[in-house]
Amino acid sequence: MSQPVKQTDFPGLKLVNRGKVRDIYDLGDALLMVTSDRISAFDVIMNEPIPDKGKVLTQISKFWFSQMEDIIPNHIISTDVADYPAACQPYAEVLAGRSMLVKKAEPLAAECIVRGYVSGSGWKDYKATGSICGIKLPEGLKESDRLAEPIFTPSTKAELGTHDENISFDEMVKVCGKELAEQAREATIRIYCRAREIADQKGIIIADTKFEFGVYEGKLIIIDECLTPDSSRFWPKDQYQPGGPQPSFDKQFLRDYLETLDWGKTAPAPPLPEEIVTKTGEKYKEALFKLAGITV
C-alpha cells in the first residue's frame, strides 16, 4: 500500500478546481484530472483519506469507459503518464495509476442519475410520496426492490459543501436544452443497462449510479468518472435480499457508520476509526477486483 494522497500540489501546474475527490489542473489544451484518496459522505469531506482509493476509482472508470465507447465517447486522452506534457513528468510517481489526461469539455449543468432499485434517498422519497423524484411507482414496493424499468432522475450540480437537489426532466431541459437533455438521458439508461448485465455476470448488482456529461467539439461525451463505488451502489448478488438495506462494495458502508453517530451531516466531519478506514478501502478494492480482475 502506498502513502495516501489527500491532496496534490504541483508547482508549475495550474490548479483550477479541487472538488470532493478530484484535483483538476489546466494544461492549456487539455485537463489533468487527479483522483485523490479523499472520501466524502453526505457532501462532507472526511478528514482521513482511504489509501489507494484514487487508484481504484481511476482503474474502475477506465474499465467502464472502455466498455461503453460504442454508446458514447469519453473524455480520456491518455492514462499513461509518459504521454502527459513535460510539465507533469516531475510528478509522475504521484500521478501513476490515479490520473487521466482528459479533453476540455463544457459540462452539462445537471448530473444524470439512473436507479434500477428502490434504495437510499429514493427509498425515503418513495416511503413519503409513493414516487421517486416525482416519478410515480407501483404501490407495495419494499426497500431494495428491483424496479420493472430503470428510472432517470437528474439532479443539480451543487457547489462544494452544499447538497445536490433532484430536478424533473423538464427542469433539466430548461438548464441543458432539449436535445442535450434527451441525448444524456438515453446514454444514461443505455450505459446502465449494459453495465448491469456485465456486473451481474461477476456477482455484483448495480443498484443505481450517477454520470456526468459534457460537450466537446459540438458532441456529447461522458466525463468525470464512470460506475465507480463513489458514484454507484454496488451490492453482492449472492447476499441480495429485498426488504431492507443491502451489504455493499461502496461508500454505503461509511454512510451506515456515520448514521450511527450523533453528527449533523455538516462540516467538520467526525474522526473515522482506523477500522472503518481500512474496511472502506477493502470494499473499494474488492469491487475493482470483482469487476475488472485488477488489484492495486
From Swiss-Prot:
Any S-S bridges, and between which cysteines? none
Q: Recorded E.C. number(s)?
A: 6.3.2.6
On whether Methyltransferase is a keyword of this UniProt record, the answer is no
Q: Which GO terms describe its cellular component?
A: cytoplasm
Q: InterPro entries from the xrefs?
A: SAICAR_synt/ADE2_N, SAICAR_synth, SAICAR_synthetase_CS
The reaction(s) this protein catalyses: 5-amino-1-(5-phospho-D-ribosyl)imidazole-4-carboxylate + L-aspartate + ATP = (2S)-2-[5-amino-1-(5-phospho-beta-D-ribosyl)imidazole-4-carboxamido]succinate + ADP + phosphate + 2 H(+)
Q: What class of enzyme is it?
A: ligase
Which molecular function term from Gene Ontology is one that the record holds?
phosphoribosylaminoimidazolesuccinocarboxamide synthase activity
Q: What GO terms in the biological process aspect are recorded for it?
A: 'de novo' IMP biosynthetic process
Q: Which Pfam families match?
A: SAICAR_synt
- Which keywords, in A-to-Z order, does the entry hold? ATP-binding, Ligase, Nucleotide-binding, Purine biosynthesis
Pathway the protein acts in: Purine metabolism; IMP biosynthesis via de novo pathway; 5-amino-1-(5-phospho-D-ribosyl)imidazole-4-carboxamide from 5-amino-1-(5-phospho-D-ribosyl)imidazole-4-carboxylate: step 1/2
Which positions carry the signal peptide feature in this UniProt record?
none
Its family remark reads: Belongs to the SAICAR synthetase family.
Q: What is this protein called?
A: Phosphoribosylaminoimidazole-succinocarboxamide synthase
